[in-house]
Amino acid sequence: MVVQGTVKPHASFNSREDAETLRKAMKGIGTDEKSITHILATRSNAQRQQIKTDYTTLFGKHLEDELKSELSGNYEAAALALLRKPDEFLAEQLHAAMKGLGTDENALIDILCTQSNAQIHAIKAAFKLLYKEDLEKEIISETSGNFQRLLVSMLQGGRKEDEPVNAAHAAEDAAAIYQAGEGQIGTDESRFNAVLATRSYPQLHQIFHEYSKISNKTILQAIENEFSGDIKNGLLAIVKSVENRFAYFAERLHHAMKGLGTSDKTLIRILVSRSEIDLANIKETFQAMYGKSLYEFIADDCSGDYKDLLLQITGH
């Protein structure tokens, strides 16, 4: 299977021309949102970084500041998200999830429970650079208990990603987490944590297979029964992204748009952060899971320039 995003480098890219087009779109009375949307959604992140540099060189102003003064609401948030480097964007999202009153635990889970080791280390470095704070310390001060321990485990970026599948070890781990959960009264969360945070994805696949052989439940059902609250959601996120990452993000997008109201933060975060990785696959999986395209959901749920920008990010 080909894993691909919906946003690719623009073939006849000219960053100076794009910078000039953006300047023209914001000069004088009114704003040409169509031009802004087209450029931001059809250039790769690396190309957008070049446009930012050229914009400042040509006009002595920062593109983000100009956009902030011209745009507003969710359209502004999505446009600025596209201008951030991927690791900076996710570091900002983590910071926003923790600042002020209350913590957005779902954002912490979406970001920290689905990344590779390299991505985790890049996000931690970006966080330090942007906020002069240690991400792990911030997480510890904003979360507690088993959920905190799970996130701290994920923040180590210590998954054995190259570990080959070993059926005997998988059977041992499956037995250990069975004993830590279903096999006893009460739950030993640390055992689940140790296995889910460190084993490679292929090895975890094998562990889940072995688990269903010794239990009459799948690993997902066991977690649903044994845990509650944020720790449950965190463990489920890891298992779901091991089993089918595209389905995990399709489900999160659907959840952001179904029913009354829209979680625009979730929508922007997932569409922007997955746009060059696997958004094409997520789109396809979304259609298969919900019998309605991601395009239709966004078109029904969002409006105006914001809607147009999201639709262009998804390749429409």
Curated annotation (Swiss-Prot):
- GO molecular function, a single term: phosphatidylserine binding
Gene3D superfamilies, alphabetically? Annexin (1.10.220.10)
**Superkingdom of origin organism:** Eukaryota
List-wise, which residues carry Phosphothreonine?
A: 6
Post-translational modification (record)? Phosphorylated in vitro on serine(s) and threonine(s) by PKC.
Q: Could you tell me the keywords of this UniProt record?
A: Annexin, Calcium, Calcium/phospholipid-binding, Phosphoprotein, Repeat
List residue spans for each Annexin repeat: 13-84, 85-156, 168-240, 244-315
- One matching Pfam family: Annexin
Q: What's said on domains?
A: A pair of annexin repeats may form one binding site for calcium and phospholipid.
Summarize the subunit comment: Homohexamer.
PANTHER family (alphabetical): ANNEXIN, ANNEXIN B11
Designated name of the protein: Annexin-B12
Query: What is the name of the gene encoding this protein?
Result: ANXB12
